[in-house]
């Protein structure tokens, strides 16, 4: 049975080992460095999904990110004070078991417990999943580097509906 927990310094190598298996060997240190930065900075966190001691998924969130990109002024204003989900991954063999949902709920709880107004994210293909399972609402669609992306958000108010 799997479980969700906050990643700690001692988890860095296991995360890189278990989730970096498909990366070229020279890319694993890059992953390890990125994971370490998420764990060490106080304004962000990394959650991991574990099956026994094997890391099978992760999610990352930043409390008060710098909002960049080609967003309208209205969208930027709406996203102020919201934490940003910056990553979500579940190993292929573990998908459709509720792990992704548990990781998203852990991030939302983290943001709300820190006094945040809500959370937002950018997605290419999973917008319907976030709307259906968590009540996220579409803020804006953009094209970045030729790829269509959807900006979604969920606030305390929309969470209670």
Task: Describe each region flagged by the PLM.
Residues 1-10, 158-161:
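Conserved N-terminal entry element of GNAT/NAT acetyltransferase domains
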Residues 7, 88-90:
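Hydrophobic adenine-recognition pocket in adenosine-nucleotide-binding enzymes
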Residues 24-50, 60, 66:
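Active-site rim helix/loop that mediates acceptor-substrate recognition in acyltransferases
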Residues 26, 50, 54-87, 95, ...:
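Conserved acyl-donor/pantetheine-binding loop and adjacent beta-alpha core of acyl/acetyltransferases
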Residues 85, 119-122:
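Conserved hydrophobic beta-strand within the GNAT/NAT acetyltransferase core sheet
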Residues 90, 96-109:
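Conserved acetyl-CoA-binding loop-helix of GNAT-fold acetyltransferases
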Residues 113, 117, 124-148:
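Conserved active-site alpha-helix within GNAT-family acetyltransferase domains
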């Amino acid at each position: 049975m799997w479980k969700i927990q906050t990643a700690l310094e001692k988890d860095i190598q296991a995360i890189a080992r278990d989730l970096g298996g498909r990366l070229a060997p020279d890319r694993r240190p890059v992953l390890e460095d990125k994971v370490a930065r998420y764990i060490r900075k106080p304004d962000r966190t990394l959650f991991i999904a574990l099956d026994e001691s094997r890391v099978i998924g992760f999610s990352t969130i930043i409390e008060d990110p710098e909002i960049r990109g080609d967003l309208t002024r209205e969208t930027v204003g709406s996203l102020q004070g919201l934490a940003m989900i910056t990553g979500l991954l579940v190993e292929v063999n573990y998908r459709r078991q509720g792990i992704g949902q548990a990781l998203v709920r852990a991030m939302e709880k983290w943001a709300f417990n820190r006094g945040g107004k809500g959370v937002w994210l950018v997605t290419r293909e999973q917008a319907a999943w976030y709307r259906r399972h968590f009540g996220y609402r579409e803020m804006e669609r953009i094209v970045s580097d030729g790829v269509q992306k959807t900006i979604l958000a969920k606030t305390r108010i929309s969470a209670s509906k």
